[in-house]
């Protein structure tokens, strides 16, 4: 059943048809249904990889689970590295981010040492939906609701997420049908962590209120956001190419035809400020636009820079 399902997934077919099968990769293996599914997927496709398991020691059973994973990988003919996190790394006030930084640094180190060409992560559709909803509630820009990307780079090494379109229930049911045992990590339900609260409370509540699954609409929103971001970059590029630099002053012409397009004007200004190492808030961008639209000169401070707005031009000193 496992191989039959995976062979019928066209997005996976596209992914693996473009993967360089001559190279070797790293698989982040937690032992949960997601990463075990990915292990068997990579194995069934003939991908050469090394599994890396990070034991944070957060659960009493974690050491035994790490040993069981080693035995499973040995039985499957998959090389595995098990890393037990030192106690001093477990006391951070922000355990989620501290753990993430630790494992990414470890993955990077292993890739360099073993000459591996990418890191496989088993994030799935539900993880993606959680990311998008979190960004919506945090007030992210429309172009930044795109969630996790299928391929990004960390310190020059590709991060590969081929399961982003597959719901978690599909992964777990497929393993259940094949009688493949996996770990149920209780930290995934520990509501001290935001992700667990979203997973256990917010999503079920929203779906109960709406009477429908909200994962797919959030994935659609992420796709729309990705497309919007690409489109806006294309539209903004002709204007950004006209940035001028005189000594330490950057200037950008904002023609009337651009000012008539509010969204694009603010996007161009945002990218202009970003090129100078400045992240501008929505309020600041709106203020700049209001002065441009009304033809009113202004001088404002943004971080350690001075922003000057004149008729049809924005300058950064």
Swiss-Prot record:
Protein residues bound to ATP: 30-35
Main localization of the protein described in the UniProt heading: cytoplasm
Catalytically driven reaction(s): cytidine(34) in tRNA(Ile2) + L-lysine + ATP = lysidine(34) in tRNA(Ile2) + AMP + diphosphate + H(+)
Pfam families: ATP_bind_3 (PF01171)
Any one biological process term the GO annotation gives: tRNA modification
Known EC number: 6.3.4.19
Keyword presence, tRNA processing: yes
Gene3D superfamilies in alphabetical order: HUPs
Record-level Gene Ontology MF annotations: ATP binding; tRNA(Ile)-lysidine synthase activity
Parts forming coiled coils: none
Compartments it resides in: Cytoplasm
Keywords for this protein: ATP-binding, Cytoplasm, Ligase, Nucleotide-binding, tRNA processing
Gene Ontology CC entries for this record: cytoplasm
Domain notes: The N-terminal region contains the highly conserved SGGXDS motif, predicted to be a P-loop motif involved in ATP binding.
Protein function: Ligates lysine onto the cytidine present at position 34 of the AUA codon-specific tRNA(Ile) that contains the anticodon CAU, in an ATP-dependent manner. Cytidine is converted to lysidine, thus changing the amino acid specificity of the tRNA from methionine to isoleucine.
NCBIfam families reported for this sequence: lysidine_TilS_N
Family: Belongs to the tRNA(Ile)-lysidine synthase family.
PANTHER family listed in its UniProt record: TRNA(ILE)-LYSIDINE SYNTHASE-RELATED (PTHR43033:SF1)
Protein name stated in the entry: tRNA(Ile)-lysidine synthase
Provenance organism: Chlamydia felis (strain Fe/C-56)
Originating gene: tilS
């Amino acid at each position: 059943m496992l191989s039959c399902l995976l062979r019928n997934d066209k997005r996976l077919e596209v992914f693996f048809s473009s993967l360089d099968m001559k190279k070797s990769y790293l698989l982040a293996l937690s032992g949960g249904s997601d990463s075990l599914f990915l292990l068997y997927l990579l194995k069934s496709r003939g991908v050469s990889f090394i599994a890396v398991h990070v034991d944070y020691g957060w659960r009493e059973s974690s050491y035994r689970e790490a040993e069981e994973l080693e035995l499973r990988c040995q039985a499957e003919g998959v090389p595995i590295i098990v890393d037990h996190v030192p106690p001093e790394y477990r006391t951070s006030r922000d355990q989620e981010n501290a753990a993430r930084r630790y494992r990414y640094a470890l993955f990077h180190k292993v890739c360099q040492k073993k000459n591996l060409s990418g890191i496989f992560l088993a994030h799935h559709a539900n993880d993606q939906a959680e990311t998008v909803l979190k960004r919506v509630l945090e007030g992210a820009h429309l172009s930044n609701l795109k969630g996790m990307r299928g391929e990004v780079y960390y310190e020059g090494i590709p991060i590969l997420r081929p399961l982003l379109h597959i719901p978690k229930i599909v992964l777990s049911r497929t393993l259940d049908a094949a009688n493949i045992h996996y770990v149920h990590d209780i930290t995934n339900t520990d509501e001290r962590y935001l992700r667990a609260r979203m997973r256990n409370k917010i999503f079920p509540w929203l779906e109960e209120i709406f009477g429908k699954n909200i994962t797919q609409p959030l994935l659609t929103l992420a796709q729309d956001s990705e497309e919007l971001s690409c489109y806006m970059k294309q539209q903004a590029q002709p204007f950004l190419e006209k940035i001028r630099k005189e000594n330490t002053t950057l200037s950008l012409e904002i023609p009337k035809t651009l000012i008539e397009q509010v969204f694009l004007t603010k996007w161009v200004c945002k990218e202009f400020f970003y090129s100078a190492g400045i992240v501008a808030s929505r309020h600041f961008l709106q203020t700049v636009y209001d002065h441009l639209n009304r033809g009113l000169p202004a001088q404002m401070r943004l971080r350690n820079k001075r922003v000057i707005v004149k008729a049809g031009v924005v300058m950064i000193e």
